[in-house]
Amino acid sequence: MANFISLKKNEDILDTIKKQQKIHSNQIVVYFRKTNLKNVRLAISISKKKFKLATQRNRIRRLIKAWFIAADIPIKSYDIVVLVKPSFIDGSFVLNCNNLKIILQRIINKEKR
């Protein structure tokens, strides 16, 4: 899924969250909604209250974006908002990637229904 676009408008992010289609784990919460666009739009939200250092927030953002670029998951025309929980730092990169993969597989399964 190398071709994703950043979801930047606050109203689009809020619409995705209000849609209330979400999947969560201990490390992350993923809100998603179907759109008419050809690409996936991705927003990563990391709370400043939970992660004080900007270097931590930027590292988490880079890790999640790198995983989305490297993953070969056939999701098209979705808006995805990823909310990161504080336990994300405690887990290893492999564990966090597996959680993301499981969550995106669940999104694909919901799409097939």
From Swiss-Prot:
HAMAP family: RNase_P
Subunit structure and binding partners: Consists of a catalytic RNA component (M1 or rnpB) and a protein subunit.
Domain of life of the source: Bacteria
GO BP term, example: tRNA 5'-leader removal
Transmembrane segments: none
EC number: 3.1.26.5
Its job: RNaseP catalyzes the removal of the 5'-leader sequence from pre-tRNA to produce the mature 5'-terminus. It can also cleave other RNA substrates such as 4.5S RNA. The protein component plays an auxiliary but essential role in vivo by binding to the 5'-leader sequence and broadening the substrate specificity of the ribozyme.
Keyword tRNA processing: yes
Record organism: Ureaplasma parvum serovar 3 (strain ATCC 700970)
Keyword Lyase: no
Keywords for the protein's UniProt record, in alphabetical order: Endonuclease, Hydrolase, Nuclease, RNA-binding, tRNA processing
Catalytic activity: Endonucleolytic cleavage of RNA, removing 5'-extranucleotides from tRNA precursor
One Pfam short name: Ribonuclease_P
The protein's name: Ribonuclease P protein component
